[in-house]
Amino acid sequence: MEKFLVTPVRCYYELELPQAPRRRKRWPLLLAMHGYEGNKDSMMRVARRVADGRMVVISLQGPNQFFRHSGDGEPKNFPVGFGWGTTYKMEDSIKIHHRNVCALISLATRKYHADPSGVFLMAFSQACAYNYRFVFTYQHQVRGVVAVCGGVPGDWHENPHYSAARTHILHIAAARDEWYTREKNLQFRRQLARRAASLDFRFYNSTHRFPRSSIPHIRKWIERHL
């Protein structure tokens, strides 16, 4: 007989506060999430460049840790990667993600002078679908979503909680993505266009990596939607 218990788990994040002269009472918030096998530090390096000292930046680390096998040697020396969940009881992983996003938005608003009307989520790979689940469930909480090399939720048509959101979306696809074909990405574009407040969908000549050449456009896109 399967049962369960609930225990508190620490979820870690990196924080960077704005460096630009303060011309407003509150700052926009960029909440960034890494891909599968990534971590908060790797995503913060990208998010910092996007924010350019003009946003409160939080890089949240996935709650699930595992060893990344890197050849021979002692397992204790293997690098550690993090993820957001698997297909095993995925609803639990989704609830944790939603709860953490809400908690960080609240924290940034209360403690770090973030503007609750200027919240942007940015994700790479696996975390993209989690963010899409969030914004199409909580349709009025997020100003914009930046999704890089990711897909839409697998329950896009079946989940009764999803509906059109006031959220603007910038989706960056890789033309040479090993996981998502061009046809699959075009399908994502059609799906997102039906539910986003606006959609900017772009292909970059890249494999399944965060194309650094996209950072200037991401920055301008965020500025345009503030």
Set out the residue ranges of the language-model regions.
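The feature captures the conserved acid-bearing segment of alpha/beta-hydrolase catalytic domains
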Residues: 150-226
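Primarily recognizes the serine-hydrolase "nucleophile elbow" in alpha/beta-hydrolase
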Residues: 117-164
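A generic structural signal for alpha->beta connector loops
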Residues: 54-57, 118, 141-142, 166, ...
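Hydrophobic/aromatic beta-strand patches that form the interior of the parallel beta-sheet core
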Residues: 31, 58-60, 120, 146, ...
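Serine-hydrolase catalytic machinery in alpha/beta-hydrolase-like enzymes
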Residues: 4-114, 118
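Conserved alpha/beta-hydrolase "nucleophile elbow" surrounding the catalytic nucleophile
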Residues: 34-36, 122-124, 174
